[in-house]
Amino acid sequence: MALPSALWWPG
């Protein structure tokens, strides 16, 4: 996705 994975996945 356009958003960074850090926003969805912890750490």
From Swiss-Prot:
This protein's record includes keyword Amino-acid biosynthesis: yes
| Keyword field | Amino-acid biosynthesis, Aromatic amino acid biosynthesis, Leader peptide, Tryptophan biosynthesis
GO BP terms, alphabetized: L-tryptophan biosynthetic process
Give the protein's function.
This protein is involved in control of the biosynthesis of tryptophan.
Q: What is the protein's given name?
A: trp operon leader peptide
**Source organism of this protein record:** Thermus thermophilus (strain ATCC 27634 / DSM 579 / HB8)
Q: What is the lineage of its organism?
A: Bacteria, Thermotogati, Deinococcota, Deinococci, Thermales
What gene name is given for the protein in this entry?
trpL
